[in-house]
A protein has these predicted regions:
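Bacterial Sec-dependent N-terminal signal peptides
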Residues: 1-34
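Polar, glycine-rich mid-to-C-terminal structural blocks
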Residues: 239-241, 270-284
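Membrane-proximal, proline-rich intrinsically disordered regions
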Residues: 26-77, 254-255
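A solvent-exposed, charged loop/short amphipathic helix patch at secondary-structure junctions
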Residues: 247-267
Length: 284
């Protein structure tokens, strides 16, 4: 009898041990997967908010292998002085062959990336962030931190657009969220004239240079600084003042469908003065 009772006790305990994990996992199973979170749930949580911000940062290029180098090999690969054997294509140099053979397309500016498409994706993500991010006191997301986040995103949007301007010239400048349910006429925005884009980015960089810090501690290194704003602004204004974009008659026929010219045909020497002042501001 005692042996039977002991055996029954052991069986009962084993069943209990087997069932406990099932009940303890109920809360876990009730949780919504990260990839199924609503946008409200994201911005109600400080950690998810930071993850969204990190996603906006995601298009910032590697300075060695991407932005400073064309196709990872240097802008000089587009020059007439550079030649290569077709047999080198098997070693990953195929992109350079595309350049030399005239089969290079705007979507191949950066290998493995579609800069045009990805820029608009990140800009939209940034605009959503600016609209949704908020203070969460019980999660230590303060008003001050929210403002810092917003300024970082504003910089990133301006920075991404400055890259677009450098690579493509005029493009549709979108500064507010567009509703996907809008009509095709609204969504198919025409390209914005070059000088209009420059003026917008000029104002953004200048304003942010007065807000963003000059440096960060090691924990936050890599975030945008006032110096970065001034440097990008000076570089952009220098190109805008150059003969390439300042009254270049070669672009006189580059217009939108409604006839709006995308490049000014009037040479303006004041652009050089503005560029010089901007460069001096960086040095000082």
């Amino acid at each position: 009898m005692k042996k039977y009772t002991y055996k029954k006790y052991i069986q009962t305990m084993m069943l209990a041990v087997a069932v406990i994990p099932f009940f303890s996992s109920c809360d876990y199973l009730d949780k919504e997967p990260d990839d199924m979170l609503t946008i409200d749930a994201v911005f109600d949580n400080a950690d998810y908010t930071k993850q969204w911000l990190a996603g906006v940062y995601n298009l910032v290029p590697d300075p060695l292998w991407e932005y400073m180098n064309f196709a990872g090999y240097g802008y000089y690969m587009m020059s007439d002085e550079t030649q290569m054997a077709s047999s080198l294509g098997q070693f990953g140099w195929g992109n350079l062959m595309n350049v030399q053979q005239g089969s290079w397309t705007p979507t191949q500016i950066i290998p493995g990336k579609n800069l045009w498409k990805e820029t608009y994706q990140k800009v939209r993500s940034g605009l959503i962030f600016l609209e949704r991010v908020k203070e969460i006191p019980d999660q230590r997301q303060t008003v001050e931190l929210v403002e810092r986040y917003k300024n970082e995103v504003r910089f990133l949007i301006a920075y991404y657009y400055s890259r677009m301007l450098e690579v493509y010239g005029p493009f549709p400048l979108i500064t507010s969220l567009m509703d996907v349910n809008d009509s095709g006429e609204v969504l198919k925005k025409e390209r914005t004239p070059y000088d209009e884009i420059v003026n917008y980015l000029d104002n953004e960089f200048m304003e942010l240079s007065k807000i963003l810090p000059s440096s960060y501690d090691n924990v936050n290194i890599g975030r945008p600084t006032s110096g970065a704003c001034l440097a990008l602004r000076a570089r952009m204004l220098m190109f805008a003042a150059s003969p390439l974009f300042n009254g270049n008659e070669d672009f006189k026929d580059v217009v939108n469908k409604d006839g709006t010219p995308l490049f000014s045909q009037s040479k303006d020497n004041k652009k050089w003065e503005k560029a010089a002042v901007a460069a001096k501001l960086v040095i000082d």
